[in-house]
């Protein structure tokens, strides 16, 4: 897959009910005749140089989307690995700074590329937090995606709280939790943490009305999932 083979889809993030649109999440997808999917194997096969070049392309494509859709608000996933790159941070500031009020950067919980010593891992975490602080001071909105999984453990999330405005939890991780009661306690713990820090808490992966109503009873306001809208090929003004 080269850069001509992938496209952006978008999925709504809503507040309280399906009618209140907060923003759309941009999703990188590879299209085939029958479906569109995230190209995981291709992503994992990239060299460091290819990885960086692909992110340059993503940054420029997102800028084009923002310029063509002047009133829409979006979010885009960027991995921790991309945000430790000083060159990519410079490109983000150059291309996205003027759109920062309409764009949320969702930081995914992707593990570091390659094997790292404890000291190297500490240096990576420090560089990541420094770059997050830099973007935060410039007025960018940062969100932590898939909290409670992978490298987005409670300890790591706590270390990044000063620089983020949102926490996102996915119900797709429910199979890792034993019972519905455990899940409720888990969600409410994250929700309490977000509220105590003045952060937005979003639950994604919602597929049914029952799930929507259950989360509403728990006091969870911001939601995302197939129930509110399946990812759709992004249509830009002027297309």
Where are these regions (language model features)?
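Bacterial c-di-GMP phosphodiesterase EAL domain
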Residues: 1-98
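Active-site glycine- and acidic-residue-rich loops that bind
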Residues: 80-87, 140-141, 145-151
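EAL-type cyclic di-GMP phosphodiesterase domain
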Residues: 32-56, 81-86, 99-137, 171-192, ...
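A general structural detector for well-ordered alpha-helical segments in enzyme core domains, enriched
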Residues: 61, 88-95, 124-132, 153-160, ...
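Helix C-cap/helix->beta junction micro-motif
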Residues: 70, 99, 138, 163, ...
């Amino acid at each position: 897959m080269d850069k001509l083979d992938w496209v952006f889809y978008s999925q709504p993030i809503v507040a309280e009910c399906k009618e209140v649109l907060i923003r759309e999440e941009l999703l990188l997808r590879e299209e085939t005749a029958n479906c569109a999917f995230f190209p995981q194997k291709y992503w994992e096969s990239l060299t460091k140089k290819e990885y960086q070049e692909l992110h340059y392309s993503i940054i420029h494509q997102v800028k084009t989307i923002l310029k063509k859709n002047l009133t829409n608000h979006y979010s885009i996933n960027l991995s921790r690995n991309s945000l430790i790159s000083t060159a990519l941070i410079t490109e983000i500031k150059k291309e996205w700074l003027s759109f920062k009020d309409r764009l949320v950067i969702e930081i995914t919980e992707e593990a570091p590329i390659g094997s790292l010593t404890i000291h190297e891992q500490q240096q990576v975490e420090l560089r990541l937090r420094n770059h997050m602080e830099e973007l935060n001071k410039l007025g960018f909105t940062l969100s932590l995606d898939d909290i409670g999984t992978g490298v987005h453990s409670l300890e790591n999330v706590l270390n990044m709280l000063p620089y983020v405005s949102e926490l996102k939890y996915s119900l797709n991780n429910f199979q890792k939790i034993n019972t519905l009661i455990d899940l409720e306690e888990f969600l409410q713990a994250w929700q309490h943490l977000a509220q105590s820090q003045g952060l937005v808490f979003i639950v994604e992966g919602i597929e049914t009305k029952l799930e929507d109503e259950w989360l509403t009873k728990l006091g969870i306001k911001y939601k995302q999932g197939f129930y509110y809208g399946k990812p759709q090929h992004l249509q830009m003004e002027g297309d």
